[in-house]
Amino acid sequence: MKSAVETGSGLQTMTYREALRLALREELSRDERVFVMGEEVGLFEGSYKVTAGLMDEFGEERIRDTPISEEGFVGAGIGAAMVGERPVIEIMTLNFLLVAMDQVVNHAAKVGAMFGGEVRVPIVIRTPNGAGNQLTAQHSQSFDGWFAGTPGLKVLAPANPADARSMLKAAIRDDDPVLFIENLPIYKLKGEVDTDDDNPARIGRARIAREGTDLTLVSHSYATVRCLDAAETLASKHGVSVEVVDLRSLRPLDVETVVESVARTNRAVCVEEGWPSFGVTAEIAARIQKACFDELDAPVERVGMAEVPLPYSKRLELEAMPGEGRITAAALATLEGSGVLRP
């Protein structure tokens, strides 16, 4: 099976899924040490078809199907990385990575420091998270903050196809363990990708996804898509100019870009798909409060998942999620509280 998306064909429109597949194909071709391993990544072509066609192209040795044992094959990947290989592990959902949390947190993230830098662990763990597909409480969680709080582990979460390709390439070439977080609804998102540009992204750099002057929305992954929708609504219906900062990387975290934005707009709303208590938005809000204390015209607001096990009901699921409506409401409340808008 040959993909319609090819390297070196200039600027192309492709889905997030296709951008990931292109990055994998490019890195598998570039470096023989790279291999892919996970449940159904080969014959079935991946649960989300990211690895479609790769087994036909690179063979069973480099596109390896595994048993249903996340702890086992993540551990095998760590071992392979320690002896010089560059494994890319696919986990069907971030929820299942909890089964292998000891391998990730106590081994992959710590081996480099415990061996004084003499041993590196260049492993990439790809996995989607998030809600919106009626997969209920155990398959709809976002544990981004849990892993981002672990020293020694890099955590990336791109929000568009171009970043998905360039950041996955960067992750594969990095000498440290990288958790590469994707999102189920975002796989079908389309965007332009420059296939002539083989340069990997710089890990640890946020991007300004939309410029604005009245308020800053800070987010990552699919929450960035929702923030961009909210920013458009705020502009068209309320005349508000909103800046959107896409973090892209949770660890390392680009605090400087966030702080520079909030210092300009004087207001911030932080958005994540996870539960807000002890989460990513709590960390971002704390960083903003410390660095921008004198510039803030209103308290930093946070929007996240309702703090309940997610129900199956579609209506209740949507109400629990940090959608465009809740983000817009939080932004308006922040603006009204600082006198920009009248209630």
Locate predicted features.
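Thiamine diphosphate
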Residues: M1-P177, I181, L318, P343, ...
